[in-house]
From Swiss-Prot:
EC supergroup of this enzyme: transferase
UniProt-annotated glycosylation sites, renumbered to this chain: 41, 64, 75, 114, 118, 136, 143, 154, 168, 225, 242, 288, 353, 376
Protein name per UniProt: Receptor-like protein kinase THESEUS 1
GO cellular component terms, A-Z: plasma membrane; plasmodesma
Posttranslational mods: Autophosphorylated.
Location in the cell: Cell membrane
Gene Ontology MF annotations: ATP binding; protein kinase activity; protein serine/threonine kinase activity
Active site feature: 634 (proton acceptor)
Note: Semidominant suppressor of the cellulose-deficient mutant procuste1-1. This protein was called 'Theseus' after the Greek mythological figure Theseus, who slew the brigand Procustes.
EC id: 2.7.11.-
Lineage: Eukaryota, Viridiplantae, Streptophyta, Embryophyta, Tracheophyta
Length: 855
């Protein structure tokens, strides 16, 4: 980790630290600190927790409960986790509230060792009167010491009731509870929503869960360092590129609070440290510092960003931009102008619509403004809070009434059925009327508009200009073809020109039941042509600027590429201003569905190697087979498709970029790709080379081996990123410990060793240390040979080369990056040929789509 902090920051804090609680400005009217199951007061982080059985203002309503005490030795730093209250039936804590308004609800859980209860098997559901806080939370992947959950809810009555609901054949437990008043002005009722940028009101009616609270550049701050008892974590593990930042510090006592930003907003220790742009030797001034935060994609998020200019020596010298999920949240931000000084805190709130983030990742970035004299950007703190959904839940879609057994929801069941029936009948009548009207309007439009007229306003031209002649042709596959004509370029390999009516018939008028996927450019449907051929139809969305750009890029790439391991194209349709590409249908879909997330039989080790080899051949052809290399930029398991014989093809060229020419070493370009697969050097320098694809392919290799996503936010933090996690095991020589359990005892150790070495080389931090795709292909084929040959005969030692007798390849040392790979056995290395084109149509393909926000 390239930080200038570590010991210096710790020494700095020790030299200037004073306990902030001594100068607390806010005294919470309600301040319940409850130690559940304890028989005496417990001191934790300089705060006193009172036993739940002795608190005078607390009413504990329980059915069957008991106390669990840890059988391990007592640890004073985690003393509240030595006991727990265990419930086998519905139970509740009732708190008397003296001051209405927002309150923190903090829950502490630790499945302590106990001879009576197996708390690791507990399933926890916690609700208030109005909101679901936790729903069937389990400890299946738990390997830490405790779990801490923090919520804020607006209490509008004299009492706050927390109900704990065990699931069937399980128990629920809790170690400690905090219910603490929140300052009235800490969370506003309105914030700016992004994409589209509009005010979002009504926050006071919603509940929040703290997902992240980060101290940029500084150490962990516990409740002892915060006047409101909050915890601020160090941000290092969420930086997309650790070496992209330089930490700057100031004396906490020099921070100048204002009436609008007080000690309650954030401690001065947060504003006294900052991450700034490090000297990363970037080629582009648009380089950003980015934090990647795994989130639940089904919720909105309240994002608060904290700033304080402790960097500048003079006013108006630091101007930068803030981005949330690639949306410009703040442009040309000059902190000294906004605060009328230096070292004056400032914060801004936003609402991010997480429901469109299918990747489950929220990103926050800062970068220099294009007009700034100094290339720099900074951030001091970041808070991300999950917002309750329409069901008033922070965990799933179930409401409180549906979770409480025998609650008020069941009492009004008959009434709800009657009302629902009436509403349904009225809705059905209105729906029929609307459908009739829409059909009438559509019929009139179809009669009044000819297909030829629709062609006059094409927003796109699916005809790459490669100096080839254009010829007008008609589709002859249907009798409907005589009604229209369209432009076709057979010589550009765009294939057959389809009539729009043919597409409509093939997809049953784009029936939603035929939907295969959704992407930034539009949708992909499964269809069947008149001759019975199954196809995948990609229909572009003309309102999506990103989609149109990716759509054109894919057309341009596919028109000049033909290879057995690249997606092939049947034809297109540009009638009626449509943007439609037609591919042959890929029977076995994306590689990812065969690894996890789908109920499919596990792939054997040999099958996995053959699939990786096929994908490597496709990428090697992209890099070396065309007149100018092509960089895919979005290599991942959803973009590797499998035909009925599990032959792999690389798909989705929407982000592809022509590589550097012979006199160039790289292409400077804005960073695009998918988090988890993105080359850190490309992200840091914005210099794109073929080695960026190699890095992404290394992630794919680890994904194939371990059968888990590239990013998995539900795992412990050190396991979230598969590249970092798997590399740690590979360097210890223990890669077999984390591979898919279906492969245990079924993999030749020599083959696994070569596979791991190949992936490790691909995931090198710097591109110069990574192999070419040709070298990767060579080594994967070697791993396959080792799998097919006796381990005793083929066991490689540390000094072995990658020469395999019997394979027609030029002998070379493994990963010799000084060599230019021109030809390999079994790899088509020339430019696209008719033979290649014929080969490319032997298996069915379609381009797997992912949501563009995940890129």
């Amino acid at each position: 980790m390239v930080f200038t902090k570590s010991l210096l920051v710790l020494l700095w804090f020790l030299s200037c630290y004073t306990t902030t609680t001594s100068s607390a400005l806010f005294n919470p009217p309600d301040n319940y600190l409850i130690s559940c199951g304890s028989s005496q007061n417990i001191t934790f982080q300089n705060r006193i927790f009172v036993p739940d059985s002795l608190h005078s203002s607390l009413v504990l309503k329980i059915g069957n409960s008991s106390v669990a005490t840890s059988t391990t030795s007592n640890n004073s730093t985690n003393s509240i986790y030595q006991t727990a209250r265990v419930f086998s039936s519905l139970a509740s804590y009732r708190f008397k509230i003296t001051s209405l308004g927002r309150h923190w609800i903090r829950l502490h859980f630790s499945p302590i060792n106990n001879s009576t209860w197996n708390l690791t098997s507990a399933s926890i559901t916690v609700v208030t009167e109005d909101f679901v806080l936790l729903n069937n939370f389990s400890f299946n992947n738990f390997n830490g010491s405790y779990i801490f959950k923090e919520y804020t809810v607006n209490v509008t009555s004299e009492f706050l009731t927390l109900s704990f609901i065990p699931s069937n054949n399980s128990v629920v437990f809790v170690n400690a509870i905090e219910v603490v008043s929140v300052p009235d002005n800490l969370i506003p009722d309105q914030a700016l929503a992004l994409n589209p940028s509009t005010p979002f009101s009504g926050l006071s009616l919603l509940a929040f869960e703290t997902v992240y609270r980060l101290n940029m550049g500084g150490p962990l701050l516990t409740s002892q360092n915060d006047t409101l008892g909050r915890q601020w974590d160090n941000d290092a593990e969420y930086l997309h590129v650790n070496s992209s930042v330089l930490v700057v510090t100031a004396n906490p006592s020099s921070i100048k609070y204002s009436p609008s930003v007080t000690q309650e907003t954030a401690p001065n220790m947060v504003y006294a440290t900052a991450d700034t742009m490090g000297d990363a030797n970037v080629a582009s001034p648009s380089f950003n510092v980015t934090w990647v935060l795994p989130v639940d994609p089904d919720f909105r998020y309240f994002v608060r960003v904290h700033f304080c200019d402790i960097v500048s020596q003079a006013l108006n010298t630091l101007v930068f931009n803030l981005y949330v999920n690639d949306d410009l949240a703040l442009g040309s931000l000059d902190l000294s102008t906004l605060t009328n000084g230096l070292k004056v805190p400032y914060f801004k709130d936003f609402i991010s619509n997480g429901s469109v983030e299918s990747s489950g990742v929220l990103t926050v970035s800062v970068g220099p403004d294009s007009q700034a004299d100094i290339t720099n950007a900074t951030m001091n703190g970041l808070e991300v809070l999950k917002i309750s959904n329409e069901a008033k839940s922070l965990s799933g879609v179930s409401s409180v009434k549906s979770l409480l057994p025998g609650g008020s929801g069941s009492k009004s069941k008959k009434k709800a059925v009657i009302i629902g029936s009436l509403v349904g009948a009225v809705t059905l009548i209105l729906l029929i009327a609307v459908c009739c009207y829409c059909c009438l309007v559509a019929s009139r439009k179809q009669r009044s508009t000819s297909p030829q007229e629709g062609g006059n306003g094409h927003p796109w031209l699916p005809l790459p200009l490669y100096g080839l002649s254009q010829t007008l042709t008609k589709s002859t596959a249907s009798h409907k073809s005589a009604t229209a004509s369209c432009i076709s370029l057979a010589s550009t390999h765009l294939g057959r020109c389809f009539m729009f009516q043919e597409i409509m018939d093939a997809t049953n008028k784009f029936d939603e039941s035929s939907l295969l996927g959704v992407g930034g450019f539009g949708r992909v449907y499964k269809g069947t042509l008149e001759d019975g051929t199954k196809v995948a139809v990609k229909r572009g969305n003309p309102r999506s600027e990103q989609g149109m750009a990716e759509f054109r890029t894919e057309i341009e790439m596919l028109s000049k590429l033909r290879h057995r391991h690249l997606v092939s194209l049947i034809g297109y349709c540009d009638e009626r201003s449509e943007m439609i590409l037609v591919y042959e249908y890929m029977a076995n879909g994306p590689l990812r569905s065969h690894l996890y997330g789908a109920d499919l039989p596990p792939l054997s080790w040999k099958q996995r190697l053959e699939i990786c080899i096929g994908a490597a051949r496709g990428l090697h052809y992209l890099h070396t087979g065309a007149s100018q290399s092509i960089i895919h930029r979005d290599v991942k398991t959803t973009n590797i498709l499998l035909d009925e014989n599990l032959v792999a093809k690389v798909a989705d060229f929407g982000l592809s970029k022509t590589g550097p020419s012979l006199d160039q070493t790289h292409v400077s370009t804005a960073v695009k790709g998918s988090f988890g697969y993105l080359d850190p050097e490309y992200f840091r320098r914005q210099q794109l080379t073929e080695k960026s694809d190699v890095y992404s392919f290394g992630v794919v290799l680890m994904e194939v081996l371990c059968c888990r996503p590239a990013l998995n936010p539900v795992l412990p933090r050190e396991q979230v990123n598969i590249a970092e996690w798997a590399m740690a095991w590979q360097k210890k020589g223990l890669l077999d410990q984390i591979m898919d359990s279906n492969l245990t005892g079924k993999v030749n150790p020599a083959s696994l060793k070569k596979f791991g070495e190949t992936a490790e080389k691909c995931l090198a931090e710097y591109g110069v240390d990574r192999p070419s795709m040709g070298d990767v292909l060579w080594n994967l084929e070697y791993a396959l040979q080792l799998e097919e040959t006796s381990s005793a005969l083929m066991e490689p030692d540390d000094n072995s080369t990658n020469h395999i007798p019997g394979i027609p390849m030029a002998p070379m040392e493994p990963f010799d990056n000084s060599m230019s790979i021109i030809d390999r056995g079994g790899v088509n290395s020339g430019t696209g040929t008719d033979d290649d084109a014929e080969d490319a149509t032997t298996s069915a393909v379609f381009s797997q789509l992912v949501h563009p926000r995940g890129r």
